[in-house]
Amino acid sequence: MASVAPKIAKDVTELIGNTPLVYLNKVAKDCVGHVAAKLEMMEPCSSVKDRIGYSMIADAEAKGLIKPGESVLIEPTSGNTGVGLAFTAAAKGYKLVITMPASMSIERRIILLAFGAELILTDPAKGMKGAVAKAEEILAKTPNGYMLQQFENPANPKIHYETTGPEIWKGSGGKVDGFVSGIGTGGT
């Protein structure tokens, strides 16, 4: 067990990243090599999507596209990206409007609302296309509105190039022979 006391973060976004790696000894018991997993459930909101929520907001800020207290962030989502955006938006002082199909879990809705996001549910029969269309409609009517566009935003996968990849490389001592990951928007 580590005996060094952690520093106190100035806000929750400083806790994103640097998640541990652990060997899966039982899974790889009869294997020649080692299998390790990156424990992204150790992120502040228990998801790898915390990284991309932060990355897309920080990138838009750095480009001067949004400002806390002025800009209204709008995003269609069906999953944890919305949670990552909601907690980052709350920490940084942004209003966030999330559109999502009404078929998404009540637990996810409660978390989004707890972080202060405005939640607009769309027809589940229209899937994500319906949520995207509703977000675009809201954007057109919202002064200072900005859509992060997780499906097209280079800051989404870029955070893994900048942080997750180097963390894996460093944590493994540069001994990575293979890598397995699920991919949706590229933010996983």
UniProtKB/Swiss-Prot annotation:
Q: Name one GO biological process term.
A: cysteine biosynthetic process from serine
Essential cofactor(s): pyridoxal 5'-phosphate
The listed locations are: Cytoplasm
Broad class of the protein's primary localization: cytoplasm
Q: Name one Pfam family in it.
A: PALP
Signal peptide, first to last residue? none
The record ties this protein, via InterPro entries, to: Cys_Synth/Cystath_Beta-Synth, P-phosphate_BS, TrpB-like_PALP, TrpB-like_PALP_sf
| Matching CDD domains | CBS_like
Amino-acid biosynthesis is among the record's keywords: yes
Binding of pyridoxal 5'-phosphate, residues: 80, 184-188
The alphabetical list of record keywords is: Amino-acid biosynthesis, Cysteine biosynthesis, Cytoplasm, Lyase, Pyridoxal phosphate, Transferase
Name any GO cellular component annotation: cytosol
Alphabetized GO MF terms: lyase activity; transferase activity
Q: Which residues carry this modification: N6-(pyridoxal phosphate)lysine?
A: 49
- PANTHER family tied to this protein: CYSTATHIONINE BETA-SYNTHASE (PTHR10314)
Please state which protein family the record places this protein in: Belongs to the cysteine synthase/cystathionine beta-synthase family.
The protein depicted here goes by the name: Putative inactive cysteine synthase 2
Q: Which gene name does the record give?
A: OASA2
